[in-house]
A protein has these predicted regions:
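Gly/Pro-rich interdomain helix-loop hinge
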Residues: 1-76, 118-119, 124
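Short, amphipathic C-terminal "tail helix"
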Residues: 75-126
């Protein structure tokens, strides 16, 4: 989700005025700086922040994927469209810096299930 939000050319921005232009990458870089994570540029700092978060998740016992929690693939895929719709309709979604398209939410769920990383150019088009 951090990589998704940090896009410098999102398909759709969030609805609040503070999201009138992409600046999330720079904000994540500020967090990395505050934590002393290093990096030569904002993208490198973002990757260092993600690495630190993943290390913390491992330390506290959060599994890497939805699949790792024993969720059956068939059941997951059967419920995927409903989960996407509920996530899209959730009141908090509009407060996200980057407002996701339903196809993007679906891809994020699939990535979370299979343990894939977000890559901007691999995101499905609406």
């Amino acid at each position: 989700v951090l990589r998704f939000n940090a896009s410098e050319a999102p398909a759709k921005m969030g609805t609040f005025s503070q999201y009138d232009h992409p600046h999330t990458l720079a904000r994540y870089a500020e967090i990395a700086d505050f934590l002393g994570l290093g990096g030569k540029n904002d993208k490198e700092k973002l990757e260092n922040l993600i690495k630190a978060i993943n290390e913390l998740k491992e330390t506290v016992g959060i599994k890497k994927t939805i699949k790792d929690y024993g969720v059956d693939e068939k059941v997951f895929l059967e419920n995927l469209d409903e989960m996407v719709e509920q996530a899209f309709d959730d009141q908090c979604t509009g407060a996200n810096p980057r407002y996701p398209l339903m196809s993007e939410i679906k891809q994020m769920y699939l990535n979370a299930y299979y343990g894939k990383h977000f890559v901007e150019n691999e995101m499905p088009k609406a």
